């Protein structure tokens, strides 16, 4: 148990049990290490848990093997053939935004290397290839006022080359590189972007849909909403309203996704026979101490505010009760007249719910959760 640690006195504790030295009764509370140690004794060692055991076998014969890219990450050709500026063009050209002031002006030069890229995919023997369309390459100002046919031709050549190699294209409509012209009128904060995104999706479905069976509306909306508009660590680099703007942007992303899904479902699905969904990203979260309820609760909040932020409206309808309650209560406690989380109308809830054909999910890591007291700070991190 914790004890008098010589020169450190009672400032540190190495024991299996915590001792409250401020209490005259000196109560003992088992730490996680005590539970772990008792399990080691019980097992007389360290048997490998089932979830750590190697699995052997074969995937189904129709299992999809794929690789994935994003337009700004690989294409280059940032001003080629009439392409408009994107928010990542501006962001990466701003000093000190990207390490070494690197940018995607040329990147992998995939705009000029379609045949070479497809040859590499053939060597990998993949069955599918996921890539994204650069919105500003086909619609330089983000609207259908001017359609850049040269940009569309690039994607026609890529899709045709993939199909000739017996590789199915899987197209993402939006992978973060919003046309700068739309950002100039507040981008995803401005509700008009919902119609602009629908118009853009309509163009792509009409031009490429007869060749493409797999679609993603928006890739990783969490990153767009919070990394780009809360932390400001990615384009468009906005960080001065972290308690409100991410939720406004997320709200419009969900409505834009729903409109694109319904457009495909109502106008194109019967003829083109494809499938379409949103792709959500999220870390998983485990309690730092699985025997402490506050850590268990913190882990649940992380998941609800990460994957649940976007999955709950799409799959279940509306934001989760946990998310709505926490943000509302913290907003009111800070003296605000209402919740910082926008509300969906009953019609919008119905419109968004069920807008999926599959569960698109990107997962990279797992984090340990524990409560942190942010006081009345109005911020996404404090909310969760």
Where are the language model's segments positioned?
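Active-site region of glycoside hydrolase catalytic domains
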Residues: 1-98, 122-123, 141-143, 149-384
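Alpha-helical scaffolding within the catalytic cores
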Residues: 51, 113-117
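A common structural microfeature
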Residues: 62-64, 111, 128
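Active-site mouth loops of central-metabolism enzymes
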Residues: 99-113
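Short, well-structured secondary-structure segments
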Residues: 127-134, 168-172
């Amino acid at each position: 148990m914790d004890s008098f640690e010589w020169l450190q006195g009672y400032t540190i504790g190495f024991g299996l049990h915590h001792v409250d030295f401020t209490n005259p009764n000196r109560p003992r509370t088992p730490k996680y290490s005590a539970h772990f140690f008792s399990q080691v004794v019980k097992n007389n060692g360290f048997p490998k848990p089932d979830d750590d055991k190697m699995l052997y076998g074969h995937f189904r014969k129709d299992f999809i093997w794929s690789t994935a890219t994003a337009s700004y990450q690989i294409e280059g050709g940032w001003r080629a053939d009439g392409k408009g500026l994107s928010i990542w063009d501006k962001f990466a050209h701003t000093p000190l935004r990207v390490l070494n002031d690197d940018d995607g002006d040329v990147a992998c030069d995939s705009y000029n290397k379609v045949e070479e890229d497809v040859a590499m995919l053939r060597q990998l023997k993949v069955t599918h290839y996921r890539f994204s369309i650069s919105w500003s390459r086909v619609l330089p100002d983000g609207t259908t006022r001017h359609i850049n046919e040269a940009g569309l031709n690039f994607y026609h050549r890529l899709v045709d080359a993939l199909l000739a190699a017996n590789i199915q294209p899987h197209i993402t409509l939006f992978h973060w590189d919003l046309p700068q012209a739309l950002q100039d009128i507040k981008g995803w904060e401005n509700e008009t972007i919902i119609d602009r995104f629908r118009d853009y999706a309509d163009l792509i479905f009409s031009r490429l849909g007869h060749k493409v069976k797999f679609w993603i509306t928006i890739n990783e909306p969490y990153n767009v909403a919070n990394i780009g508009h809360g932390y400001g660590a990615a384009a468009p680099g906005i960080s001065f309203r972290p308690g409100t703007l991410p939720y406004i942007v997320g709200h419009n992303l969900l409505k834009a996704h729903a409109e694109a899904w319904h457009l495909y479902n109502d106008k194109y699905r019967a003829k083109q026979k494809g499938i379409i969904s949103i792709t959500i990203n999220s870390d998983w979260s485990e309690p730092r101490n699985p025997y402490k309820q506050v850590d268990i609760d913190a882990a649940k909040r992380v998941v609800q505010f990460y994957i649940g932020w976007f999955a709950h409206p799409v799959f279940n309808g509306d934001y989760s009760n946990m998310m709505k309650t926490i943000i509302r209560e913290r907003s009111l406690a800070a003296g605000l007249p209402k919740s910082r989380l926008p509300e969906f109308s009953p019609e919008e809830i119905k419109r968004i719910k069920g807008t999926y054909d599959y569960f698109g999910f990107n997962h990279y890591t797992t984090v340990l959760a524990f409560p942190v007291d942010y006081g009345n700070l109005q911020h996404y991190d404090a909310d969760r």
